[in-house]
């Protein structure tokens, strides 16, 4: 029983450390003309969003809440 409690505490601590120092990558939503966002269908990895993000000058993007999100996209580059 003590091993289970100790294991649980260790897992929780590593989870907290991961959320504190996790990969909180900056980014932005790329915009079309007239400030519309690029929509996408399935959340997660998306070839469409990667292509959109490459048009905006960054290497990687994915679908988040049915909208493309580009990692490391700066505010000045959000519009084409």
Curated annotation (Swiss-Prot):
Residues 25-80 form the LCN-type CS-alpha/beta domain. Its main location: secreted. It is found in: Secreted. InterPro entries: LCN-type_CS_alpha_beta_dom, Scorpion_toxin-like_sf, Scorpion_toxinL/defensin. It holds the Pfam family Toxin_3. GO terms for molecular function: ion channel inhibitor activity; sodium channel inhibitor activity; toxin activity. Residues 1-22 form the signal peptide. Expressed by the venom gland. GO terms for cellular component: extracellular region. Belongs to the long (3 C-C) scorpion toxin superfamily. Probable ion channel inhibitor. Has the structural arrangement of an alpha-helix connected to antiparallel beta-sheets by disulfide bonds (CS-alpha/beta). This is Toxin-like peptide AaF1CA1. It comes from Androctonus australis.
